């Protein structure tokens, strides 16, 4: 079989003008970026306001292996399958970060015959939104350090007298705003800045600093959750970057940098329109990771797609304990729209990996032995799929299971898995998906089951309500969302929680950063564990995004590269074509 990039290059594509017209957009509602990309103006929603909303289909998964189980392939394949059924459909996915593209997972355009194209344009830079996020974020960092420098160098009274500005009196030890970059670089997790020659302060004042990956920036979450430019601007102004000497928050508005940050992000609030290999219009917008952020594409992209099509197919990062939980408890609340149907992607290899019979860790190749028939491992790993089915039903949303088939899969085991699902819950429809090998043709059954599920009545139930305390919200996600029996707050996290509640941030949502490789915070614990504790080591306030960010276990907000990163496979041929991207 051809590689993903070869399939993409050998498939004729329509110009983006044709795709935009197919989606129902007017020429003045988008700006082309080359032949196959366009920025869609959010203002088109004013014209579409009276259109009835379509159905929102959210794709999630079992607890994945480090290489993923094919959510994006299934998302794109399902959208193409719905088109095969003559349904009006659009897909919405996140913009890939170059961190994973050059790191372990590679690209995020789908694969095989279920891709967004051109895949190299999607995976590398796209229309520059992540670079804009990085620039706007680091502008706030520069503004903060500049203000700190001038106030401390001159003294507060002299600074106020000279500038006419009120001294912010920044507590250096309280600075929470790290810098960001769109690469995996563990060496930047902890750094010192403001270093000078002896006796000089020309470079600023020395302090500890660190970098997060751009996908973890609060600005990325804000772009994904903002409804329009006005909302974007207001949210940016609420970002807390530090505290003053009295413990009061200092915001980007206080630094008078929020307006410039919004200017930097003016174009980034517009989703990018592309197409699948079968010509399904696809909106790509925002790229928050689900393990260290809220893991869903933007509300604006969803709203445009829901107004233009009968079905909008989107995905949430990692398993249903990760991006799906945050879609239900953060995104749905901000958008006032919950999914009408959820597709849970499962694979034979993923379930066997959850059996505890295999040791799969990031950077390791998937062993061929995992594809050999192993009924005991399949049955043991099935507990994980049961967990995710029950988890989706907990929110009152109909679920459909898609078994993403690999070429090496054993037919007997595929049948056995379907039997296990039917025996567990006869009301849950299950379809074999061959989206990778066959595109939309390989998801016809899945697409029909999704159409049927979308006609069912939903009884959406988030895990917590806005009025509950932050402590109650954290407990709800850990206990009801993960199945933990206890939440263990560090001394630091306990102090931070009390501080946030004292400052009046009690009504914010909670976003827990944890490993995606287990329902627990320990990546080595597989299956459907019970009776575990969730350790919360630190809280971060994301007042602009609208949530408190809890770091659990040993999760890092700046990933590192493996010993054999994906960038080793990338190069250019003599004609300038990219090779080795997958």
Curated annotation (Swiss-Prot):
Associated pathway: One-carbon metabolism; tetrahydrofolate interconversion
EC number(s) on file: 6.3.4.3
Family: Belongs to the formate--tetrahydrofolate ligase family.
Record-listed ATP binding positions: 65-72
Protein's name according to its UniProt entry: Formate--tetrahydrofolate ligase
Gene Ontology process terms (BP): tetrahydrofolate interconversion
SUPFAM superfamilies (alphabetical): P-loop containing nucleoside triphosphate hydrolases (SSF52540)
Molecular function in Gene Ontology: ATP binding; formate-tetrahydrofolate ligase activity
PROSITE patterns: FTHFS_1 (PS00721), FTHFS_2 (PS00722)
Record field: catalytic activity: (6S)-5,6,7,8-tetrahydrofolate + formate + ATP = (6R)-10-formyltetrahydrofolate + ADP + phosphate
Keywords in alphabetical order: ATP-binding, Ligase, Nucleotide-binding, One-carbon metabolism
Enzyme class: ligase
Any single Pfam family the record assigns to this protein: FTHFS
